[in-house]
Amino acid sequence: MCTMKKVTLPDEPVLEQRKDRTIEKIKDMTLKRTIARSILENLHDWFGIDESREQYIRECSDWMFFAVRENGHYAGFLCLKETGRQTVELAVMGVLRAYHRKGLGKALFHEAKKAAAKEGYSFMQVKTVKMGVYEDYDITNRFYLSLGFAEFEVIEELWGKENPCQIYVMSLK
């Protein structure tokens, strides 16, 4: 079992640090976009639509942004955006495929969840393509369920009938 220690650095706060892994809350807008681009451009199965990917990259600079470094290289990130006074949305998340199933996404999520609760939010939501439509998104759905999200609603028309939108929610209290 790895022991983790909390540390703070002057530029970007480090939320979790292990020998080979660091999770940081990123504040610099340019760095946010650089990390997002480097990750999302390598996840075409989920972010293959150029217009949508570019929108995430632009907008992520305005959101709470968490990044994980593995062996000194950025391997994933997660963004939270406020959708109401008490609610944040896990707006976009990406972990390079080579790092899937190694705990990076789960570690990122838990740090983001703690930060959202500390900021006073009561709920978190996330949207994805409904289970059973695409195999890659089935993996995503199972990941969100494993984190403790609960099914809330499916909106068939939000992204078009071929991409029904599943909304998951969780309490942060």
Language model features by range: what are they?
Residues 82-91, 100, 119-122, 164:
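A conserved beta-turn-beta hairpin within the catalytic core of GNAT-like acetyltransferases
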Residues 144, 149:
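Conserved active-site tyrosine of GNAT-family acetyltransferases
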Residues 135-140, 154-164:
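Short glycine/proline-centered loop/turn elements that form peptide/ligand docking sites
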Residues 101-114, 118, 142:
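Conserved acetyl-CoA-binding loop-helix of GNAT-fold acetyltransferases
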Residues 116-135:
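Conserved GNAT acetyl-CoA-binding A-motif
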Residues 67, 73-81, 87-94:
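Conserved beta-strand in the GNAT
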Residues 93-101, 129-132:
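A short, internal acetyl-CoA/4′-phosphopantetheine-binding micro-motif in the GNAT/acyltransferase core
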Residues 2-51:
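Short amphipathic alpha-helix that is part of the acyltransferase structural core
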